[in-house]
Amino acid sequence: IFESTSLPSAASSRGCLLEFTDANPVGCSFGAGSPSKTFVLLGDSHADEWSTPLAALADSEGWRMVTYLKSSCAVAKIPVFNIRLHRISSECAIWRSQALDSIVRLGPAAVIVVEFSSGYIQGPHSDLGEHAVDLTTWSAGLENSLRQLQAAGIPVILVRDSPTPATNIRNCLSYADWRGVPESHCATPRSLAVSSTITDAERSVAEAVPGVRFVDFSSIFCDRTSCPAVRGGIIVYRDRDHLTTSYAKNLAQPLKELLLPMMNSEATASAGPLQ
């Protein structure tokens, strides 16, 4: 269990997921040396989870992926309280602003946005207490950031965050193994793991901003009623809310089907060099 939940992502293994006190964005490149098209992965540690299948896709298709990733920092323009630093993260605000500016200068064929939405919004999955934002503030902040990309003519794929388990999956599976109880003991009801309120709010934001497409991959993680801890013999989560790199590889094909039309569009030009 420990080994299967400890494999780092493509981006984090190269130090591309910035820490809490880092403010200056770092663009990391993956894929082809002379790419036909470039796309960007933008977000927090929940976006980092997707870097492994996306890096493999960039390699296989002759594309370039550029990542802009920072732990515990929302793409949505909101004040983010960092519980480790015990304060509002000024580093997050600086990083977000500069990362968006860098992406606009880069001019990619598409930007994929993923973030731990339920971690920032008031509700059962946030540890921020009174510092979590309400849904209206979140939606307005998300729309603000997406409109900056839209104004530059950059297509955006807004991906609904992966479902959030009710417990630390690695600990739960270890305990289940010790007690001799089935893995299903660690499953989470879909109604709890997937907030329909947040899903609907983010879909509405995407519909309000031209050039933004909302995508929900929840069915890759859950069946109609439950989100298992193990699917197809693969552990889905490495902790309370992050995907294992092994399971994230299952996202390669649906991500390819999603990106191909955008990357092959004649309307999207090749991006320039990183600055």
Model-flagged regions — what are they?
Residues 1-275:
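Extracellular/periplasmic envelope-modification machinery, especially enzymes
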